[in-house]
């Protein structure tokens, strides 16, 4: 398929490509994405400015980088690590750093520096100073788990709505799923009692959110809503679900914007409303 035709003939791939590009730190985008027609207008995407989108003069113990080739062991390496294969990683510093691992070129890696303190002469580091930095390649989740950083998002493609559940990476799946629709219950109706407003009128047959969760799924539809996606899904159809019973595919069926006025809300607007509305609920688990 010609690059120019992807947005029209394979819109899922186009969206996957653009969203992955937007999440990637600017200093490694060229190495990982190169030139592509999908990204021709990527400069119009609002800057996400996430914690891992570090500027060259910003220090953080964690950084994202891209491998660029093999390296000699650091002169500060112990006898154990000296025998390992080393790799150069470009991570937005003046010169590449070294990690004691063999990693193929042009692979994205998360780096953890040995110290939280800025190196001497920061940010004007020499090549020798960069090579002397003690760095390890770690799991992308480490920055979040150890320091509480929001370290970006991942983009996963699914062949259908039901496949979102079937191909879920979590062994136990999602604890709770929310389908969004203008025909759903209010967000207040599903909040736990401790977070719900006193004026809430409990809706019959509406399941409340659990007090805690490991993995929460929120599903947003397109212009026509989620009903057509459920009705055309082979897995859901085999269970007898239709447009009229689409809400049964989720634990909760919620209208995020009561009295919206406009007949249609853009999906990207609904995402903002939904995440903002659920923030207090998510935060309550960490207080």
Model-derived features: positions:
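Post-transcriptional modification and biogenesis factors for structured RNAs
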Residues: 1-287
């Amino acid at each position: 398929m010609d690059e120019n035709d992807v947005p029209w003939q394979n819109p899922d791939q186009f969206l996957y490509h653009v969203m992955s590009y937007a999440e990637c730190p600017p200093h490694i985008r060229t190495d990982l994405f190169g030139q592509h027609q999908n990204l021709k207008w990527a400069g119009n995407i609002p800057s996400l400015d996430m914690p891992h989108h570090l500027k060259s003069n910003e220090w953080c113990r964690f950084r994202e980088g891209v491998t660029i080739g093999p390296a000699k062991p650091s002169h500060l390496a112990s006898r154990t690590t000296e025998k390992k294969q080393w790799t150069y990683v470009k991570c937005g510093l003046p010169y590449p750093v070294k990690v004691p691992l063999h990693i193929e070129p042009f692979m994205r890696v998360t780096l953890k520096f040995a110290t939280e303190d800025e190196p001497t002469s920061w940010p004007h580091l020499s090549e020798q100073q960069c090579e002397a930095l003690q760095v390890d390649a770690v799991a992308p989740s480490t920055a979040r788990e150890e320091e509480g950083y929001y370290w970006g998002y991942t983009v996963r493609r699914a062949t259908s709505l039901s496949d979102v559940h079937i191909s879920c990476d979590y062994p136990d799946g999602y604890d709770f799923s929310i389908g969004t629709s203008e025909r759903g219950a209010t967000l207040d109706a599903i909040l736990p009692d401790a977070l719900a407003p006193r004026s809430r009128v409990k809706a019959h047959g509406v399941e409340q959110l659990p007090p805690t969760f490991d993995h929460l799924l929120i599903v947003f539809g397109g212009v026509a809503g989620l009903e057509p996606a459920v009705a055309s899904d082979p897995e859901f159809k085999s269970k007898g679900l239709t447009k009229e019973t689409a809400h049964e595919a989720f634990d909760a069926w919620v209208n995020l914007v009561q009295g919206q006025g406009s007949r249609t809300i853009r999906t990207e607007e609904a995402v903002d409303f939904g995440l903002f509305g659920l923030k207090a609920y998510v935060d309550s688990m960490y207080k």
